[in-house]
Amino acid sequence: MYKKLYLIGILLLGLISGLTFNLIFFTVPYQLSEAKYTTDIVGSISLAAFPYCLKVIWSPFIDKYSIPFLGVKFGHRRGWALVSQIFLILTMMWFLKRSPCNNLCITAIILFIIAFCSSTQDIVLDAYRIERTTSKKELSIAFTFSSIGFRLGMLLGSVGALYSSIIFGWNTVYKFALFITMVGPIVILCIKEPELKTKRNTTNNLIDLQQYFEVIKKSIISFKNEQKYLLLIILFVFLYKAADSIPMAMSIPLFLDLSFTTHEIAVIYKAYGLLIMIVGGTLGGILAAKIGIFHSVLIGGVIQLLSPIMFMILATIGYDIKTFIITITIQNFCSGFAGTIISIYFASLCNSEFVATQYSISSSFSSLSRIILASLGGICAKHLTWPVFFLCNTLFSMLFIPIFYIYRKKLHFINYSKKI
């Protein structure tokens, strides 16, 4: 039992990841929407999260190079985790000194730095989960704990943010986020470094640019050799996430347009919705462990299509609490369910030599889908009615199905009929 306590640490670090993620994709966009900024501006602010899909550029350092002193004192993974946490806390302190609505350019820069620090932490956490687990089943459990923590972080950063903004103002919201983030270094110091069967080949010396690109090259070549249809995997992941990314990005502008109140959004969409998302994420992890990756990914992708369909129905009906609750239930369950499953799929694509880099490549595809589609969604929503917008979203998202069936073996679903 004691050996499994690291899962609590994974859950807490996932919570911090969810909190900082929510800052970019919900808290600041909500504040901008409340200040009557248009959907294209609200959608464009998500571009500040671009580091989430560029993690592969610096993940080789995290795989192969150890932080001086910290790497020796606390271990390779924990040393990197401490550095990312410290810089994340410092950037959050900077963010506290400014109002996001006053200068969008400065806001975007600060959010970009926060995204960089948070994505670096995610690289370390992803690698830690993979290296710390000893079986495929335990890997599924670890990803489930991380997913639950991530959703709890989103819950704190949404419901807590909305109610704090009403009672105390937005500055208190960001103080709350900073306080939660400060727990990160304590958690890192409490968990143990993964014990590897083979000695990790790392160094704490600075490397020149040629060596740096050589590490990236080896990582990508290694990944490419194992995944000969890498571009196909990229396309598949891009389409797979479309049914979740676009409704999530445009949800707040839609709800405010339909005259839902801050209280209704906080209680139904964020509090109730994120609890449903946790349930979905938990069931997704259990399903992947029971029936295997192939069938789990298919089921997750199909039920995920219900999200834009329900948003289209809600937009057509207008303000209606019952329809709103049904929409939130379906959207959040599907998001949690499919999100956990696709994370396990990413982990199955990695080998042991370049775990952090290869997982970063995989997860970057998902982040790229979310960020680009959120930005383009904001532009399209400005020129289309909400029902037409979500109808187009549904049709576009369905394209993953023929790719899945036609190229299922090339998408690394080898022995896909077997359990993981």
UniProtKB/Swiss-Prot annotation:
Subcellular location: Cell inner membrane
Record has Cytoplasm as a keyword: no
Organism in which the protein naturally occurs: Rickettsia typhi (strain ATCC VR-144 / Wilmington)
Recorded superkingdom: Bacteria
Protein's name in the database: Putative transporter AmpG 3
Keywords of this entry: Cell inner membrane, Cell membrane, Membrane, Transmembrane, Transmembrane helix, Transport
GO molecular function, one term: transmembrane transporter activity
Membrane-spanning parts: 6-26, 41-61, 79-99, 104-124, 141-161, 166-186, 230-250, 274-294, 297-317, 324-344, 359-381, 386-406
Gene: ampG3
Assigned protein family: Belongs to the major facilitator superfamily.
Subcellular location, principal: membrane
Membrane topology recorded in Swiss-Prot or TrEMBL: Multi-pass membrane protein
Cellular component annotations (GO), alphabetically ordered: plasma membrane
Pfam family, one: MFS_1
